[in-house]
């Protein structure tokens, strides 16, 4: 059975009625959760906010791109927007909370804003508790240039994504497991990622200390390959402690993204 501290609260799901909210963060920290993950996107004015998708519904049900709205307008847009927190406010809440051992997996969805996000985490003295996560190699290369040696985690598909995924994502394919430094530096308002046929290779493999892959695409061979150089493997997502237990027995990976509160209740020490 996985340990309590191996479970990652995925967007604070199960701890509040809506994901990625301050209420969910507070509830997860209050419960003693030791790893939380949240996503950062950037508004038109360059403000990092906490949300996963590249767009959201306003109070009238209209979908608006996060990259097209100004941060000052979020509360007035209603709908999903009124629940969105500035990354600065969420990090301040983490820093002020007595749960001082919870690790932060900060998943950056837009590239070209790494210095701003890094500065916010540094402002709240949380760098030592942070793993930088992204589906965008642009983000990870840039973050390593800013702060060499920081923990980096690449999220990637390790089996060919299906039509449903490709409908919503730009899918890039690694050649021979290698993802070289991309020429582009700015990725704003896009949903994209990389398919790596098997384990990562090359420069990016040397830089990352973690990878995150879909739970349904895990294999023992993939995990064993990553473990050869102590690269940690996490998988998303699970709804029960039993599912985590079964997956750990089959694959031997290191961390488990949870979309529910139940695993934390079962595994709480």
Task: Write out the residue ranges for each language-model feature.
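Phosphate-group recognition and catalysis centered on beta-loop-alpha active-site segments
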Residues: 1-269
């Amino acid at each position: 059975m996985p340990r309590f501290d191996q479970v990652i609260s995925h967007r604070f799901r199960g701890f509040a009625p809506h994901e990625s909210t301050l209420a969910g963060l507070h509830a997860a920290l209050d419960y003693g959760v030791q790893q939380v993950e949240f996503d950062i996107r950037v508004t038109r004015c360059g403000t990092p906010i906490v949300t996963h998708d590249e767009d959201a519904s306003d109070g009238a049900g209209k979908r608006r791109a996060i990259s097209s709205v100004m941060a000052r307008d979020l509360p007035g847009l209603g709908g999903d927007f009124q629940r969105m927190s500035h990354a600065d406010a969420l990090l301040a809440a983490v820093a002020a909370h007595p749960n001082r051992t919870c690790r932060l997996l900060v998943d950056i969805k837009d590239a070209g804003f790494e210095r701003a996000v890094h500065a916010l985490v540094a402002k709240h003295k949380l760098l030592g508790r942070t793993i930088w996560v992204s589906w965008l190699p642009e983000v990870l290369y840039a973050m390593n240039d800013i702060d060499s040696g920081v923990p980096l985690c690449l999220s990637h598909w390790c089996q060919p994504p299906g039509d449903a995924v490709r409908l919503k994502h730009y899918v890039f394919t690694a050649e021979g497991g290698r993802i070289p430094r991309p020429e582009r530096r700015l990725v704003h308002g896009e949903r994209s990622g990389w398919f790596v046929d098997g384990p990562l290779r090359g420069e990016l493999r040397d830089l990352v200390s973690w990878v995150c892959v879909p739970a349904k695409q895990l294999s023992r061979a993939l995990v064993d390959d990553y473990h050869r150089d102590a690269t940690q493997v996490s998988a998303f997502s699970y709804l029960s402690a039993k599912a985590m237990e079964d997956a750990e027995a089959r694959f031997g990976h290191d961390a488990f993204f949870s979309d529910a509160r139940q695993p934390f209740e079962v595994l709480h020490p």
